[in-house]
Amino acid sequence: MNVLVIDVGTSSMRGILFEHQGKCLTEKQEFYQATYLENSWVEQNPADWENALYSILKQSVAEAENMGEKIDAISITSQRSSVIPVDENIRPLSNAIMWQDKRTNYICESMENLNDKVFSLCGSRVNPVFSGSKMMWIREERPEIYAKTYKF
């Protein structure tokens, strides 16, 4: 069984095709940029991820076929806690708010009294890295986007 592993990173996406014993058959990488805005805001254009994914898939399938191999499964790993609001057609409504973005500091500070409860539920404290505060920020600061959001 050959598995194509897709890793969606902060500055690039990689696709590595492994054969059943773990040997690397092919490796592809596509680079993209984050946008660093005022006040420690960090965003990325979701279209960059989509374009990188299609490029890696196309190249990986072609190389596998050239080697007489096939792709039996795909596994995806991704940077955590980045948030993209999408509409009912799964189209992005804004850039992704990245995991290292700090725009939600004020939300997290206002919730410090909940740290013990949050920790008991999920093993983590209220922190701007995590996605919940980013969703709250969109609800509070970009209500026009939040109103159109089907999922994050």
Q: Over which residues does each language-model region extend?
A:
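Glycine-rich phosphate-binding/catalytic subdomain of phosphoryl-transfer
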Residues: 58-152
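N-terminal glycine/serine-rich phosphate-binding loop of ATP-dependent small-molecule kinases
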Residues: 1-94, 120
